[in-house]
A protein has these predicted regions:
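General beta-strand recognition
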Residues: 69-71, 94, 168
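A structural signal for short, well-ordered beta-strand segments
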Residues: 63, 123-125, 167, 171
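Short, surface-exposed beta-edge/turn micro-motifs
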Residues: 45-46, 90-93, 164-166
């Protein structure tokens, strides 16, 4: 049976908890729902942390957001997926997504920094077992990478579905953290002869390179030119 879906619209703000209130630079934290969604929707790779055999493990993997829920891609042979499906309580995890927006070069080595946006999600991940929800989750994962791609590709067959696993993680315990702005040098360092400022960092897409075996007459999809 498919799990009840969480709300599709973000809350005005997520409620802070002991785990989502930062111990340093608390002024950079935000619980704004729209900001959290925007940071998640812009990313491609999340880092999923959990405990395996008493030791911490962090794995990079693809993810997608559907409403107030994240779907995380994996293989049925991977340890976290097996652990999440082992018992009903699921797998306690911590998931992060980070964007680097600028390199902040100060006059002093100590005050170098980066401008960034990040989201941290705490919760319990569960393996998706409902076939309909699994197909929807896999479509969402494909469309998260390139919007519109799932409708322009062959759907997964039975064998591929059996080899693919998906984790579900609801956005209940969530926080964002970000740094914006320029250099924070000490007043006595301002006259030093060292360049200081911010180097912006941006994501840029190159020209698509067609596969050598592309069927004749296959044109470049509009959703790629729109990237």
């Amino acid at each position: 049976m498919q799990e009840t879906q969480p709300p599709t619209s973000p809350p005005a703000a997520y409620a802070p908890t002991d785990r989502t209130v930062p111990t340093r630079s608390a002024d950079r934290a935000s619980y704004d729902g729209e900001l959290v969604h925007a940071i998640l929707d812009e990313g491609y790779v999340c880092h999923l942390g959990f405990v395996r055999d008493g030791a911490p493990v962090v794995l990079p993997t693809l993810y997608a957001r559907v409403g107030e829920r994240l779907y995380v891609h994996g293989s049925t042979g991977s340890r976290p997926l097996r652990m999440a499906g082992r018992t009903d309580p699921g797998l306690p995890v911590c998931l992060t997504v980070t964007h680097v927006d600028g390199l902040v070069l100060a006059r002093s080595a100590f005050h170098h920094s980066i401008n960034y946006r990040s989201v941290v999600v705490h919760g319990t991940a569960h393996q998706v077992t409902d076939p309909e929800e699994k197909r929807l989750a896999l479509d969402a994962l494909v469309d998260h990478v390139v919007p519109g791609r799932s409708a322009d590709s062959r759907p997964a067959n039975t064998k591929e579905l059996a080899a693919t696993a998906v984790l579900r993680l609801d956005l209940d315990e969530v926080s964002a953290k970000l740094r914006v702005g320029g250099v924070n040098d000490e007043p006595e360092d301002l006259s030093l002869p060292h360049w200081a400022g911010v180097v912006p960092v941006r994501r840029e897409y190159g020209t698509p390179l067609a596969d050598a075996d592309l069927a004749p007459g296959t044109g470049l999809p509009g959703y790629l030119t729109a990237l």
